[in-house]
Amino acid sequence: MNKFIAAEAAECIGCHACEIACAVAHNQENWPLSHSDFRPRIHVVGKGQAANPVACHHCNNAPCVTACPVNALTFQSDSVQLDEQKCIGCKRCAIACPFGVVEMVDTIAQKCDLCNQRSSGTQACIEVCPTQALRLMDDKGLQQIKVARQRKTAAGKASSDAQPSRSAALLPVNSRKGADKISASERKTHFGEIYCGLDPQQATYESDRCVYCAEKANCNWHCPLHNAIPDYIRLVQEGKIIEAAELCHQTSSLPEICGRVCPQDRLCEGACTLKDHSGAVSIGNLERYITDTALAMGWRPDVSKVVPRSEKVAVIGAGPAGLGCADILARAGVQVDVFDRHPEIGGMLTFGIPPFKLDKTVLSQRREIFTAMGIDFHLNCEIGRDITFSDLTSEYDAVFIGVGTYGMMRADLPHEDAPGVIQALPFLTAHTRQLMGLPESEEYPLTDVEGKRVVVLGGGDTTMDCLRTSIRLNAASVTCAYRRDEVSMPGSRKEVVNAREEGVEFQFNVQPQYIACDEDGRLTAVGLIRTAMGEPGPDGRRRPRPVAGSEFELPADVLIMAFGFQAHAMPWLQGSGIKLDKWGLIQTGDVGYLPTQTHLKKVFAGGDAVHGADLVVTAMAAGRQAARDMLTLFDTKAS
C-alpha cells in the first residue's frame, strides 16, 4: 500500500515553510548557498489562502516507474524511490507523471522521497507545517476521509459540522502599521531621516502580528543573510531586547543599517505570509528598533572571550562587504586592518546614500563599535597611491577585496559631457560630504540646483536619492524620466511613494534620445521619445519599444544620469595574477578554490566588485562568507 503526503488545501496559508524545510532537509540541514540551489521536492501552488502544497503521490503502478528505461525509479517501502546514480536524464518520468511533480534538476530527476534518508524518520514538510495542513497518508486513510465526507454531505451536515479553521485561527486580524513618517512638507526642508523609529508599543504591536510560520521561514530564506527573523521577533514579544540584539548580530554585521536601507518589500517582507492578508510584518522597522534600543541601553558586542589567533588580514574597502568580513574575522580572533580611500567608513552607505535615509551618526557609532572590537581602520589611504597591493599580500596572511563598483554607466548620448549634465554618484557624494562638514573635492564637485529645472534619468533607488536630494536643495522643479512603466521600476516601492509625496514629477515610458544645448554648449533640454511596453526579454523584464512620431523635449537646467554602477578601474591589481571577467569584475570560486577565493590563493573578494552592483545586504553576506573561507584556509594550513 503506497504512502504519500496529502495536503488539506483549506488549511494552507501559503507560508512556504514546507518548501524551505524540504530544501534544507536535503542539504544536510543547512541553508542552500544560492537560490539556484533551492530545490524543494514539494511545491506550493497559488498564494495566500488560495495556496495548496503539491508533492509526489507515490502512485501504485506509478507511470514514472514504468516509463524509466534504466530502473532508476522503483517502488519500495510503500513509496516511489529514485536512484540518482542510475538516472540518465531522459525526462521520461517527468513526461509520464500525471501530476507534474517530477522535475529535472541539472539533468537529474528529482521528486519527493518521503525523507527516507532523514535520521529522524519524519517528513520535514509535515513536521514544520504551522497549520497541520500536511499529513502522511495511504490509500486506506484517504478512502476513509472520502467516505466520511460523503456521509456528512448526504446527511446535510457538511457545513454545520465544520470545525473552526486552524489557518483562520493562526492569522492575525490586526493590520500592519509600520513606523511613523515625518510629513512631506516638513521633511523636504531638511536632510534628517524621515522615518521615526518604533516605540515599545508599536514594536509590541508588530511583533504580536507575526504568526511564526517556522523556525526557518520564508522571510529567513529571502534574506541574503538568513537572519533569524521569527526568533528575534519572538524575543521582542517577550521584551528581551538584549537577547534579540545578540541574535541579530549572529547573522548581520550592520543590523541597524539594514533595518533602515534594505528594500524589505523585495526581500523578507515581500516573502511574509501576511503580505497579501493583513500586510507584512514590519520586519525592517523591528530590526532597527532592536539594535537602536539595545545600543541606547549600552549593549555592545562581547568579544572578551575571543581567543587571539596569529593571523593578520588586510581588508581593502570599508563598505558593507569589507565591514562584514572584518566583523567575522575579529570575532574569530584574527587581527584585521581595514584600508579605505574615503575619510569615513561605510563606502556607499556613507557617501552614496543620503542622510534622509541613513543618518551618518549611525555609521560613526558602528565605527566606534568595530574599533572597540579590535579592528584598525586606515582611512584616506588609497591602494596604489599610499600603499601597494604587493605590500599587503606580502605583509598579511590573507587579503580581502571589497571595493564595490564606482564606475558609472553612461547613455552614450550626444553632449553627455556638456555643462549641466552630471552623474548621480558625484552629485550625491558632494552634497553628503558638505553636510558632513568635509571639504569639497575635485573628484566630487558641488552642483548648485537651487531654482533650476532638474531632470533625472533612471528608475532605481539611486534615481530616487537624486530626485529627493534635489527637492531639498530647492530646485524649481524635479522630474524623473524613466523608459519603462511604473510597475517595472527596479527600485523600492516606498522610495517612489516618498519622492512623489515630496513633489517629484514622473514621466514614465519615455526614453532619452539626445541632449539639447544652446549656442554656448550649455544644457537646455533632453530629447525624449515615448515608449510602449513590449515582450519580456531574457531577464524576464518587458522591453520598452519606441513609439514612432512621439518625440518631444523636456526643458532642463540640470540633467542627472542615474543608470547604475559598473566595475571601476583597479590598476593596482595588474600583474597580481587575479583574473577579471569581461565586465571588469573579480573572478572567484573556480574549481579547486573556495567560493570567495581569487586565483591568487591568499586573496579573497566579495560584494559588488565580484557580482556587480547589488544590495547592501548581499555585499555584507559576501564579505562574511569570505571571512569564513579565510578561516577555513587558515585552519587547513594549521592542520
Swiss-Prot record:
It holds the Pfam family Fer4_20. Induction: Induced under anaerobic and microaerobic conditions. Expression increases in the presence of hypoxanthine, xanthine and uric acid. Expression is reduced in the presence of nitrite and nitrate under anaerobic conditions. InterPro entries: 4Fe4S_Fe-S-bd, 4Fe4S_Fe_S_CS, DPD_II, FAD/NAD-bd_sf, FAD/NAD-binding_dom, GltD-like, Helical_ferredxn. [4Fe-4S] cluster 3 binds at C56, C59, C64, C97. Residues 3-32, 47-77, 78-107, 110-139, 201-235 form the 4Fe-4S ferredoxin-type domain. GO terms for molecular function: 4 iron, 4 sulfur cluster binding; metal ion binding; oxidoreductase activity. Transmembrane segments: none annotated. [4Fe-4S] cluster 4 binds at C68, C87, C90, C93. [4Fe-4S] cluster 2 binds at C22, C112, C115, C125. It comes from the Bacteria. The keyword Metal-binding applies. Its cofactor is [4Fe-4S] cluster. GO terms for biological process: urate catabolic process. [4Fe-4S] cluster 5 binds at C210, C213, C219, C223. Keywords: 4Fe-4S, Iron, Iron-sulfur, Metal-binding, Oxidoreductase, Repeat. Binds 5 [4Fe-4S] clusters. [4Fe-4S] cluster 1 binds at C12, C15, C18, C129. Contains an N-terminal 4Fe-4S dicluster domain and a C-terminal pyridine nucleotide-disulfide oxidoreductase domain. Involved in formate-dependent uric acid degradation under microaerobic and anaerobic conditions. May reduce the enzymes necessary for uric acid degradation. This is Putative oxidoreductase UacF. It comes from Escherichia coli (strain K12).
